[in-house]
Amino acid sequence: STGSLGLDLALGVGGLPRGRIVEIFGPESSGKTTLCLETIAQCQKNGGVCAFIDAENAFDPIYARKLGVKVEELMVSQPDTGEQALEICDMLVRSGGVDMVVIDSVAALVPKAEIEGDMGDSHVGLQARLMSQALRKLTGHIKKTNTLVVFINQIRMKIGVMFGSPETTTGGNALKFYASVRLDIRRGLQIKKGDDVIGNETKVKVIKNKVAPPFRQAEFDILYGEGVSWEGELIDL
């Protein structure tokens, strides 16, 4: 379960599918990490073991705890390079002892050559190559051990696009291809209590779904310091 009733319904299988790769993408502070932490909390409630690969070095245990995550039981890794992050992910998946792995985020998976190189060096296509190699390897292991792997991704703007959407996700096309489910998450209107902003309306579109019909949508409220508002969703449903 994702912690959101509406999104679980939109996904068609009651939540994120196991043994699959899922991509959650959207603009900054749209609720991507919150949604992942909610899913981790639900997984842990059902006795699952979860891991969080924090490539962005932005994991906040206090916030995670507020969302119901058992931080003591969560495996958190802060790798130095993209290669290391994906190796750790592969190792966790192959072990068969983990139910869910979250990678936050694809944009922060910087190849070793780029980290060790100089600022002005050109590293065109390195990250895309790294992703496609890693995903080719990962897919088989994920299927065998029935692990859920979630990649959080950011949105970038393509330059000079005249027609169609100028938005694209980072890390090349491999993830689009290998992901069984792709979620596009957007922040909507602010939720106010008097003059104070207490949260945001959030819209999630299921852009790709290989396990149920795609293109369904869900809307829910994310309240600051609390996460997805269950009560609001029950009233809406």
UniProtKB/Swiss-Prot annotation:
Domain of life the protein comes from: Bacteria
GO molecular function: ATP binding; ATP hydrolysis activity; ATP-dependent DNA damage sensor activity; single-stranded DNA binding
Residue sites binding ATP per the record: 26-33
Cellular compartments annotated: Cytoplasm
GO cellular component annotations of the record: cytosol
Keywords for the protein's UniProt record, in alphabetical order: ATP-binding, Cytoplasm, DNA damage, DNA recombination, DNA repair, DNA-binding, Nucleotide-binding, SOS response
UniProt record, GO biological process: DNA recombination; DNA repair; SOS response
Function statement: Can catalyze the hydrolysis of ATP in the presence of single-stranded DNA, the ATP-dependent uptake of single-stranded DNA by duplex DNA, and the ATP-dependent hybridization of homologous single-stranded DNAs. It interacts with LexA causing its activation and leading to its autocatalytic cleavage.
PANTHER family, A to Z: MITOCHONDRIAL DNA REPAIR PROTEIN RECA HOMOLOG-RELATED (PTHR45900:SF1), RECA (PTHR45900)
Family: Belongs to the RecA family.
Protein name: Protein RecA
Organism the protein comes from: Neisseria elongata subsp. glycolytica
